[in-house]
Amino acid sequence: MFNITDKAKVYMADLFAQQDEKDLGLKVDIEKAGTPAATVIFNFCFPKELSKTYQKFEYKGFDVYINKLNFVYLKDSEVALKDSSVGKKLIITAPNAKGEEPKEDAPLEEKIKYVIAADITPGLASHGGFVELVGITKQIDVILNFGGGCQGCSSVKSTLEQGVEAQLKARFPEIKSVRDVTNHANTDNAYM
């Protein structure tokens, strides 16, 4: 399930040996598991503070704690040690962390959520923004809510029409319209 190369094990054991705290473990989590925005995160942890959903894996010099709910996403993953221009660094390859694109026969809502997460939100994130699906009407109107830097942004109309709506309609021609229900009067976080 979760493989650590021999070089990475030695490097990690050395990192643990350098810590002042001796009751540390390595917690492996996945933010947004199963979505295109999934990120695997390593953190030192105090095992006694972890919930019972974490399973312990023992290695020479350190222990790893993984949330059982993430096992499926960490299947076939590997932690390796790589040399870089700034020294050594741990690299994790987790081919199942992001889940799979919905099948052709999946519900439209599921497919739209995937496209928003995989293709649209990463572009908006460069301005601190995001968009989320609120719902789909019976007439197949897609209802969206923008947030972060997109909420109150002066360019949100063109972002909606030329970016988001164009991408969604190109992928899903059955969509009649794409509507924004965001309260753009709030410009506290707007990208300007």
UniProtKB/Swiss-Prot annotation:
Keywords: 4Fe-4S, Iron, Iron-sulfur, Metal-binding. Binds 1 [4Fe-4S] cluster per subunit. The cluster is presumably bound at the interface of two monomers. InterPro entries: Fe/S_biogenesis_protein_NfuA, FSCA_dom_sf, HesB-like_dom_sf, NIF_FeS_clus_asmbl_NifU_C. SUPFAM superfamilies: Fe-S cluster assembly (FSCA) domain-like (SSF117916), HesB-like domain (SSF89360). Its cofactor is [4Fe-4S] cluster. The keyword Iron applies. Homodimer. Belongs to the NfuA family. Involved in iron-sulfur cluster biogenesis. Binds a 4Fe-4S cluster, can transfer this cluster to apoproteins, and thereby intervenes in the maturation of Fe/S proteins. Could also act as a scaffold/chaperone for damaged Fe/S proteins. This is Fe/S biogenesis protein NfuA. It comes from Vesicomyosocius okutanii subsp. Calyptogena okutanii (strain HA). The gene is nfuA.
